[in-house]
A protein has these predicted regions:
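RNA pseudouridine synthases
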Residues: 1-151
């Protein structure tokens, strides 16, 4: 199984993020160069290649809105340090509770509204397509968005 997780493109990971602004356009592929600052435990996104930067790519699409927040589904094409947080912040979309990447205040529990929603892969022996969907956290906002996912 470990080999499967290391192979490029053999696994599809999707995440849900609750953000402060509605994205325009409603879906897009983002490509940035990420520079990791070890001391700050933070990554910075740039549009052009930088020294010691790693290319990062993700696709997002808008799913739904509450009165103040917006739900995005994100598919990672690369797996970089704080990639989703850094890339969304670079286009003005801040994840609820994420002070490090620009959201205005923390969540009461100290967490952020970023959820590993699903993983899809082909079983290495049976070749069966496996899809695992993680339930959303016990939180009213997550519960709201789960109900409105297909609305």
């Amino acid at each position: 199984m470990n080999e499967l997780f290391r192979m490029d493109g053999s696994i599809r990971k999707t995440y849900w993020a609750v953000v402060d602004n509605k994205p325009e356009p409603s879906e897009a592929t983002l490509e940035h160069w990420l520079v990791r600052n070890e001391k700050q435990n933070k990554s910075y996104a740039f549009l052009k290649e930088q020294k010691e930067a790693k290319k990062a790519s993700l696709a997002y699409h808008y799913i739904a809105s509450s009165d103040r927040f917006h739900l995005l589904e994100i598919e990672l094409h690369t797996g970089r340090h704080h990639q989703i947080r850094a890339q969304l912040a670079a286009i003005g979309l801040h994840i609820k509770g994420d002070l490090k990447y620009g959201f205005s205040r923390s969540n009461k529990d100290g967490g952020i509204h970023l959820h590993a929603r699903s993983i899809i892969f082909t079983h290495p022996v049976t070749q069966e397509l496996i899809k695992i969907i993680a339930p959303v956290p016990e939180d009213p906002l997550w519960q709201f968005f789960e109900k409105h996912e297909n609305a």
